[in-house]
């Protein structure tokens, strides 16, 4: 990782050094640096077209083109273009920033903290797993009633647990408890068979949620290690210096 950061630093130093030299090279004279002047800004003895008296071309008493008494273009008595006494700076108002749908989708995918559950988050919806319980009756019962079981799990961040088993155990307990309370409130009760099947289903979903959260946590940790290495910090500081300077 350190060698990679060093090579990146060497490449960027060489590239930005060339760009810095290009920016500092003097440029040849451009518009209004000694060449012809336009319009009507020649030497005192030079010819000017159109002849300039008290105002511009076609202006008897000064003002813009086609303005008898001064003012903006097409305005007989002053004012900005298309406005009786205002200015053209009032045409547009800054638009209000809109909330990015990508940001909203990203926040939803990361899991929303559930109020009143002590820091638990609700995971995204999953497809209920196909599970075999060892006999035809329970398999058929599960297929017919799987829609009554949770398709989302409650969980806490993985860094609050020492291993996967603790995460899954806590995830199963809180998910079944919340789902049972919600369903019972609606007047529906679960049998022992339902509870047995829910435990299996929720356990599989909690394992999937743990794997997903562990991978995301590892990726965040790897990014922090990369950007905290001394070569990368030096490289970023050098780039900021070149941009600001």
From Swiss-Prot:
**What residues does Cu(2+) 2 bind to?**
61-63
SUPFAM superfamilies linked to this entry: Prion-like (SSF54098)
Q: What is known of its domains?
A: The normal, monomeric form has a mainly alpha-helical structure. The disease-associated, protease-resistant form forms amyloid fibrils containing a cross-beta spine, formed by a steric zipper of superposed beta-strands. Disease mutations may favor intermolecular contacts via short beta strands, and may thereby trigger oligomerization.
| Topology within the bilayer | Lipid-anchor; GPI-anchor
Basic residues bias (residue ranges):
90-101
Annotated localization: Cell membrane; Golgi apparatus
Residues binding Cu(2+) 1, per UniProt: 54-55
Region described as Interaction with GRB2, ERI3 and SYN1: 23-222
Q: Where does Cu(2+) 4 bind?
A: 77-79
Please give the sites of covalent lipid attachment annotated as GPI-anchor amidated serine. 222
Region (4 X 8 AA tandem repeats of P-H-G-G-G-W-G-Q): which ranges?
51-83
Q: Which residues form the propeptide?
A: 223-245
Q: What species is this protein from? A: Chlorocebus aethiops
Q: Binding positions for Cu(2+) 3? A: 69-71
Report the sequence similarity comment from the record: Belongs to the prion family.
Q: Which residues pair up as cystines?
A: 171-206
Task: Tell me which UniProt keywords the record has, alphabetically.
Answer: Amyloid, Cell membrane, Copper, Disulfide bond, Glycoprotein, Golgi apparatus, GPI-anchor, Lipoprotein, Membrane, Metal-binding, Prion, Repeat, Signal, Zinc
Is Disulfide bond set as a keyword in this record? Answer: yes
Q: Does the keyword Transmembrane apply?
A: no
Disordered: region residues: 25-102
**Stated name of the protein:** Major prion protein
Q: Which disease is it linked to?
A: PrP is found in high quantity in the brain of humans and animals infected with the degenerative neurological diseases kuru, Creutzfeldt-Jakob disease (CJD), Gerstmann-Straussler syndrome (GSS), scrapie, bovine spongiform encephalopathy (BSE), transmissible mink encephalopathy (TME), etc.
